[in-house]
Design a protein with these regions (language model features):
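N-terminal membrane insertion elements
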Residues: 2-147
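PAS/LOV and related PAS-like sensory modules
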Residues: 2-7, 24-27, 140-179
Length: 179
Protein backbone atom coordinates (compact mmCIF):
# COMPACT_ATOMS: atom_id res chain seq x y z
CA UNK A 1 0.00 0.00 0.00
CA UNK A 2 2.82 2.43 0.87
CA UNK A 3 5.70 2.43 -1.57
CA UNK A 4 9.17 3.90 -1.17
CA UNK A 5 8.33 6.93 -3.34
CA UNK A 6 5.56 7.89 -0.87
CA UNK A 7 7.99 7.62 2.02
CA UNK A 8 10.66 9.69 0.25
CA UNK A 9 8.04 12.35 -0.52
CA UNK A 10 6.91 12.65 3.11
CA UNK A 11 7.39 16.02 4.79
CA UNK A 12 9.98 16.18 7.55
CA UNK A 13 10.80 19.00 9.98
CA UNK A 14 14.22 18.97 11.67
CA UNK A 15 14.44 20.91 14.95
CA UNK A 16 17.80 21.28 16.67
CA UNK A 17 19.63 24.25 18.17
CA UNK A 18 22.97 22.93 16.88
CA UNK A 19 23.59 23.94 13.27
CA UNK A 20 25.99 21.01 12.75
CA UNK A 21 23.25 18.51 13.74
CA UNK A 22 20.72 20.16 11.42
CA UNK A 23 23.18 20.09 8.52
CA UNK A 24 24.15 16.47 9.20
CA UNK A 25 20.51 15.31 9.32
CA UNK A 26 19.58 17.32 6.22
CA UNK A 27 22.53 15.93 4.26
CA UNK A 28 21.84 12.36 5.37
CA UNK A 29 18.15 12.60 4.44
CA UNK A 30 18.80 14.29 1.08
CA UNK A 31 21.36 11.62 0.19
CA UNK A 32 18.78 8.97 1.12
CA UNK A 33 16.36 10.58 -1.37
CA UNK A 34 14.03 12.53 0.91
CA UNK A 35 12.76 15.60 -0.93
CA UNK A 36 10.53 17.59 1.45
CA UNK A 37 12.79 18.75 4.26
CA UNK A 38 12.41 21.81 6.44
CA UNK A 39 14.60 22.76 9.37
CA UNK A 40 14.66 25.30 12.15
CA UNK A 41 16.94 26.08 15.04
CA UNK A 42 14.14 28.04 16.75
CA UNK A 43 11.96 25.83 18.97
CA UNK A 44 9.41 28.66 19.22
CA UNK A 45 8.72 28.34 15.48
CA UNK A 46 7.87 24.62 15.50
CA UNK A 47 4.16 24.85 16.36
CA UNK A 48 3.48 27.52 13.73
CA UNK A 49 5.43 25.57 11.12
CA UNK A 50 3.55 22.36 11.90
CA UNK A 51 0.18 24.14 11.96
CA UNK A 52 0.88 25.48 8.47
CA UNK A 53 2.50 22.35 6.99
CA UNK A 54 1.27 19.29 8.95
CA UNK A 55 4.58 17.45 8.78
CA UNK A 56 4.62 13.69 8.50
CA UNK A 57 7.57 13.55 10.89
CA UNK A 58 9.26 15.98 13.27
CA UNK A 59 12.84 15.24 14.35
CA UNK A 60 13.02 17.09 17.65
CA UNK A 61 16.03 17.77 19.85
CA UNK A 62 14.94 17.80 23.49
CA UNK A 63 17.60 20.04 24.98
CA UNK A 64 17.38 23.52 23.48
CA UNK A 65 17.76 26.95 25.06
CA UNK A 66 14.66 29.03 25.72
CA UNK A 67 12.13 26.27 25.07
CA UNK A 68 12.91 22.59 25.48
CA UNK A 69 11.54 19.75 23.39
CA UNK A 70 9.01 18.79 26.06
CA UNK A 71 7.42 22.24 25.85
CA UNK A 72 7.39 21.95 22.06
CA UNK A 73 5.63 18.57 22.31
CA UNK A 74 2.96 20.06 24.59
CA UNK A 75 2.32 22.79 22.02
CA UNK A 76 2.11 20.25 19.20
CA UNK A 77 -0.47 18.20 21.11
CA UNK A 78 -2.79 21.21 21.02
CA UNK A 79 -2.52 21.33 17.22
CA UNK A 80 -2.99 17.60 16.57
CA UNK A 81 -6.60 17.08 17.56
CA UNK A 82 -6.52 13.39 16.60
CA UNK A 83 -3.87 12.73 19.24
CA UNK A 84 -1.15 11.52 16.86
CA UNK A 85 1.93 13.72 17.06
CA UNK A 86 4.61 12.37 14.68
CA UNK A 87 7.73 13.08 16.75
CA UNK A 88 11.08 11.32 16.80
CA UNK A 89 13.10 12.83 19.65
CA UNK A 90 16.84 13.21 19.63
CA UNK A 91 18.46 13.27 23.05
CA UNK A 92 21.81 12.86 24.74
CA UNK A 93 20.18 12.40 28.15
CA UNK A 94 19.42 8.74 28.95
CA UNK A 95 16.74 9.76 31.46
CA UNK A 96 14.84 11.71 28.82
CA UNK A 97 13.94 8.68 26.68
CA UNK A 98 11.08 7.36 28.79
CA UNK A 99 9.93 10.85 29.71
CA UNK A 100 9.80 11.77 26.00
CA UNK A 101 7.82 8.65 25.10
CA UNK A 102 5.41 9.35 27.96
CA UNK A 103 5.06 12.95 26.74
CA UNK A 104 3.94 11.81 23.28
CA UNK A 105 7.06 11.12 21.24
CA UNK A 106 6.70 8.05 19.02
CA UNK A 107 10.36 7.04 19.09
CA UNK A 108 13.79 8.35 20.06
CA UNK A 109 17.39 8.36 18.95
CA UNK A 110 20.26 8.76 21.40
CA UNK A 111 23.10 11.20 20.72
CA UNK A 112 25.63 10.67 19.40
CA UNK A 113 23.53 8.92 16.80
CA UNK A 114 24.34 6.22 14.31
CA UNK A 115 23.26 7.41 10.85
CA UNK A 116 22.06 3.98 9.72
CA UNK A 117 19.90 3.67 12.83
CA UNK A 118 18.49 7.18 12.35
CA UNK A 119 17.62 6.48 8.68
CA UNK A 120 15.97 3.19 9.61
CA UNK A 121 13.92 4.73 12.41
CA UNK A 122 12.86 7.62 10.17
CA UNK A 123 11.84 5.24 7.39
CA UNK A 124 9.86 3.04 9.78
CA UNK A 125 8.12 5.99 11.45
CA UNK A 126 7.18 7.49 8.10
CA UNK A 127 5.79 4.17 6.90
CA UNK A 128 3.60 3.94 10.01
CA UNK A 129 2.56 7.60 9.71
CA UNK A 130 1.58 7.24 6.05
CA UNK A 131 -0.33 4.02 6.76
CA UNK A 132 -2.14 5.86 9.55
CA UNK A 133 -3.04 8.68 7.16
CA UNK A 134 -4.28 6.16 4.56
CA UNK A 135 -6.39 4.50 7.24
CA UNK A 136 -7.87 7.87 8.24
CA UNK A 137 -8.71 8.61 4.60
CA UNK A 138 -10.24 5.16 4.12
CA UNK A 139 -12.34 5.61 7.27
CA UNK A 140 -13.61 8.94 5.95
CA UNK A 141 -14.53 7.29 2.64
CA UNK A 142 -16.35 4.52 4.50
CA UNK A 143 -18.20 7.06 6.62
CA UNK A 144 -19.25 8.91 3.47
CA UNK A 145 -20.49 5.64 1.94
CA UNK A 146 -22.46 4.85 5.10
CA UNK A 147 -24.06 8.31 5.01
CA UNK A 148 -24.98 7.89 1.34
CA UNK A 149 -26.47 4.42 1.95
CA UNK A 150 -28.38 5.70 4.97
CA UNK A 151 -29.85 8.53 2.89
CA UNK A 152 -30.83 6.04 0.16
CA UNK A 153 -32.47 3.78 2.75
CA UNK A 154 -34.42 6.66 4.26
CA UNK A 155 -35.60 7.69 0.81
CA UNK A 156 -36.67 4.11 0.06
CA UNK A 157 -38.50 3.87 3.39
CA UNK A 158 -40.31 7.13 2.66
CA UNK A 159 -41.42 5.82 -0.75
CA UNK A 160 -42.63 2.57 0.84
CA UNK A 161 -44.50 4.53 3.51
CA UNK A 162 -46.24 6.64 0.86
CA UNK A 163 -47.21 3.50 -1.09
CA UNK A 164 -48.64 1.79 1.99
CA UNK A 165 -50.59 4.93 2.85
CA UNK A 166 -52.04 4.92 -0.67
CA UNK A 167 -52.75 1.19 -0.47
CA UNK A 168 -54.88 1.67 2.64
CA UNK A 169 -57.15 3.92 0.56
CA UNK A 170 -57.74 1.13 -1.94
CA UNK A 171 -60.39 -1.52 -1.50
CA UNK A 172 -60.86 -4.79 -3.24
CA UNK A 173 -64.01 -6.39 -4.58
CA UNK A 174 -64.40 -10.04 -5.39
CA UNK A 175 -67.19 -11.95 -7.00
CA UNK A 176 -68.40 -15.28 -5.66
CA UNK A 177 -65.72 -17.13 -7.68
CA UNK A 178 -62.91 -15.14 -6.01
CA UNK A 179 -62.26 -12.94 -9.02
Amino acid sequence: MIDNADILNASILIVDDQKANVQLLEQMLREAGYRRLTSTMDPHAVCALHRDNHYDLILLDLKMPGMDGFQVMNGLKEIETNGYVPILVITAEPGHKLRALAAGARDFVAKPFDLVEVKTRIHNMLEVRLLYKHLEQYNQELEQTVQERTAELRESEARFRRLTELASDWYWEQDENGH
